């Protein structure tokens, strides 16, 4: 991983990512900041289950990654590290760490399987995926999103896999 990408991954904040403009399996990543917050707090297994399941369903579906996936992985890894540190004294943290290991295993298997596919060339920098040309519109318009999905999503799904494998070798 190059130093620019490493620094970006280490310093980017949830609020720096335009989640409402990133695709997921079922729409946009608008709810991700709140879901990351629930996971970070580790207050209850029930709350962690709901937030974690929603994130998992939206970053990977049928071995496909979405535009939000590589960015979500940054924050899930940070949450995992915190859960590991707190797992001895917090049963929710212990549970969350186990669940994240399962999710990371699924992600790693998708990466392994995806390496056999053809990929778009990766962008020079990880954060280039947030360039305006790759983002969905600021305003939600379901009809416009459907049209854009049909035209551009194949590239973004394949590019997200290429970015994860090129820039984020720390995830597997």
What annotation goes with each model-predicted range?
Residues 48-49, 69, 73, 90-93, ...:
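Residue-level detector of extended alpha-helical repeat arrays and alpha-solenoid scaffolds
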Residues 36-43, 79-91, 171-172:
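Helix-loop junctions that connect tandem helical modules in alpha-solenoid scaffolds
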Residues 94, 101-171:
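Acidic, serine/threonine- and proline-enriched intrinsically disordered linkers and terminal tails
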Residues 58-62, 79, 83, 106-114:
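Residue-level signature of the C-terminal ends
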Residues 1-48:
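N-terminal "cap/leader" segments of large eukaryotic alpha-helical scaffolds
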């Amino acid at each position: 991983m190059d130093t620019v990408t490493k620094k970006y991954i280490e310093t980017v904040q949830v609020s720096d990512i335009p989640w409402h403009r990133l695709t997921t399996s079922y729409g946009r990543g608008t709810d991700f900041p709140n879901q990351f917050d629930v996971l970070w707090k580790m207050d209850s297994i029930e709350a962690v289950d709901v937030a974690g399941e929603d994130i998992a369903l939206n970053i990977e579906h049928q071995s496909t990654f979405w535009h939000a996936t590589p960015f979500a992985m940054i924050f899930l890894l940070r949450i995992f590290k915190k859960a590991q540190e707190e797992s001895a004294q917090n049963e929710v943290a212990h549970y969350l760490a186990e669940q994240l290991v399962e999710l990371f295993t699924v992600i790693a298997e998708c990466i392994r399987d995806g390496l056999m596919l053809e990929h778009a060339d990766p962008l020079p920098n990880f954060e280039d995926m947030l360039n305006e040309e790759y983002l969905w519109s600021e305003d939600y318009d379901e009809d416009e999103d459907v049209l854009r999905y049909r035209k551009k999503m194949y590239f973004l799904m394949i590019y997200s896999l290429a970015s994860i494998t090129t820039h984020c070798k720390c995830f597997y």
